[in-house]
Regions:
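Short, structured coil segments at secondary-structure junctions
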Residues: 9-11, 146-147, 192-194
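The substrate-binding groove and active-site-proximal loops of carbohydrate-active enzymes
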Residues: 39-46, 91-100, 172
């Protein structure tokens, strides 16, 4: 319901998903009648900090203090398998397989982020021709090549590609969020681009 509401609201209206926050604590913990009657405070003292943090994230985003571009790996990140080894037809994505359904749901989430203004980019160690193939021949792909503002599929170190992406988009490295299934790649990026 909140996702649908968020999709239908004008761009200048932002939703603080209190339902999701309260579910983390339970409604008995979230709401305290004493605080409501004393100060008309809808959140218990115990749950006030997460409520304020979530509100601060929304306000921060309004003032440009948030990530602008989500940079994602491809293999075992938006589809199951390695396209260079398994070929596009051998990748796991889509209905009928729990793993494939999870990758499809992740792609749907990424597309929602794009529709809300988050830029999407690819940074993958692959030959570009192999990396592009699933976008062309797999109808289960929710994301299309056109959804990405930058597409780096090569064998350069990922920190180098991330620098290039930031430069192309004219944004700082601190405006990038990097998503990769490989802990070694994440650590390499973390070490080289602190």
């Amino acid at each position: 319901l909140n996702r649908e509401l968020g999709d239908r609201l004008p761009a200048y209206v932002h939703v603080n998903d209190v339902e999701s926050l309260s579910a983390n604590y339970g409604l008995m913990e979230w709401f305290d009648l004493r605080f409501w009657f004393h100060a008309k405070q809808p959140v218990s003292f115990k749950c006030l900090l997460p409520y304020v943090r979530n509100t601060a994230r929304i306000v921060g985003a309004l003032f440009g203090c948030s990530a602008k571009c989500l940079v994602i790996d491809l293999d075992n990140t938006i589809w199951g398998g390695v396209v260079g080894d398994d070929g596009p037809a051998g990748l796991v994505i889509g209905e009928g397989n729990p793993v494939g359904e999870a990758f499809k749901a992740f792609q749907q989430y990424l597309l929602q982020l794009k529709q809300r203004g988050v830029l999407l980019a690819v940074c993958s160690k692959n030959d570009e021709i192999n990396a592009l193939a699933p976008f062309k021949i797999r109808p289960e792909m929710v994301l299309k090549r056109e959804d990405f503002v930058s597409f780096k599929a090569n064998w350069l170190p990922k920190p180098e590609n991330l620098r290039e992406i930031a430069s192309e988009l004219n944004i700082g490295l601190n405006a990038l969020v990097f998503v990769d299934d490989n802990p070694a790649e994440r650590e390499h990026v973390r070490f080289n681009l602190p």
